[in-house]
């Protein structure tokens, strides 16, 4: 499969893949979704051929996002999202908890 992307579109695709993999795997240890790691590595490995070598680092033969990439604002975007949804999730969970307690009182 071939996809024609501009440099800017490719950079956005890297961000999308990184964020998706972060959400799926950042809290996992031994039970990672390795197929997503593989896709991320395939995409980031294309950086070297496309003038974006500073975005990658190679460790034990595997390509990973570099510290420069990770420090470039991507984690701030993830944190902004987490901040935006945290209170919604908390409110919903507390409401479910409280409704459960109220329902138990009437049963």
Residue ranges and their predicted role:
Residues 1-4, 15-107:
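Positively charged, low-complexity terminal tracts
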């Amino acid at each position: 499969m071939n996809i024609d992307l501009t440099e800017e579109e490719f950079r956005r695709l890297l961000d999308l893949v990184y964020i998706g993999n972060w959400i799926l795997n950042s809290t996992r240890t031994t039970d990672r979704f390795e197929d997503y790691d593989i896709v991320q590595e395939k995409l980031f490995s294309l950086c070297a051929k496309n003038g974006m070598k500073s975005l990658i680092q190679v460790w034990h033969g595997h390509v990973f996002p570099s510290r420069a990439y990770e420090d470039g604002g991507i984690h701030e975007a993830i944190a902004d999202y987490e901040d935006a949804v945290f209170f919604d999730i908390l409110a919903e969970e507390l409401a479910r908890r409280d409704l459960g307690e109220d329902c138990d009182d009437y049963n």
